[in-house]
Amino acid sequence: MLKQAGNQSFRPFISFAQKSLFNRQITGNHWIFARFKFYPLNKIVNYNHFHSSSCQSEAKNFYKQFEGDISDPPPKGPFDIDLGALKSSYLRKMKTLHPDVAQGKDAALAQRDSAELSKAYNTLKAPLTRAEYILQLQGINPVSEDISNSDPEFLMEIMDVHENISASRDSPEKLLQLSQENQGRKVQEINEIRKAMESSNWDSALLYVNRLRYWNTIDKILHDL
């Protein structure tokens, strides 16, 4: 549950947040304001989806693991994926890795391939992790954008949303409305990501990916109330 900071308004936190939060880049030590506390972004972002650049060349391309069943990533293919085809391909391939089927194959190797396939599936099925992975395929760190410099109005919008959540925490109806509004924001960001990636506008894509990550965090906060 959100906790009130005494009788103080949320507004006094803004100047402090701008100095201590929003003037830092979104890296492993970046902090995000949530539930009237500061949390490091690396506690929110699942870095297990990403490899270092040195490891990426050795890892299997997630899209190629489902080659022939889903389209190529942007800009060659669309951002959207046929989720039904992705799931069917995943389940079919997982069956071939089952110990009863993969006879003669090293058990450890089959287990590794199964883990890689699951990781690829879980990454590609969700818009945010898919977008982050596509950026990585382009050699772009998906959590490197400094939103504090590129989109200060967006940061103020986030602060307003947190304030609205705090004011509505005892009203299920208002919280539901805030959740629906946040879903609309996420759809809008995904639309912008789609347009940017399919036109090879990677700077814009990175900006909107980071915006979507913030709205996903708002989802988590609302879900936990």
Swiss-Prot record:
Gene3D superfamilies, A to Z: DnaJ domain (1.10.287.110), HscB, C-terminal domain (1.20.1280.20)
Database matches in InterPro entries: HscB (IPR004640), HscB_C_sf (IPR036386), HscB_oligo_C (IPR009073), J_dom_sf (IPR036869)
Gene Ontology MF terms: ATPase activator activity; Hsp70 protein binding
GO annotations of cellular component type: mitochondrial matrix; mitochondrion
UniProt effect for mutating D100A: Inviable. Abolishes jac1 ATPase activator activity
A Pfam family matched in the record: HSCB_C
Residue ranges annotated for the J domain, each copy included: 61-137
Effect of P99A: Inviable. Abolishes jac1 ATPase activator activity
Chief location of this protein within or outside the cell: mitochondrion
Short motif HSP70 binding, span: 98-100
Phenotypic effect of disruption: Inviable.
Protein's GO biological process: [2Fe-2S] cluster assembly; protein complex oligomerization
Subcellular location: Mitochondrion matrix
UniProt keyword annotations, A-Z: Chaperone, Mitochondrion, Transit peptide
Residue stretch of the organelle transit peptide: 1-49
NCBIfam families: hscB
Complex and partners: Interacts with ssc1.
Family under the similarity heading: Belongs to the HscB family.
Role, per record: Co-chaperone required for the assembly of iron-sulfur (Fe/S) clusters in mitochondria. Stimulates the ATPase activity of the mitochondrial Hsp70 chaperone ssc1, to mediate the transfer of iron-sulfur clusters from isu1 to grx5.
Protein name as annotated: J-type co-chaperone jac1, mitochondrial
Lineage, top ranks: Eukaryota, Fungi, Dikarya, Ascomycota, Taphrinomycotina
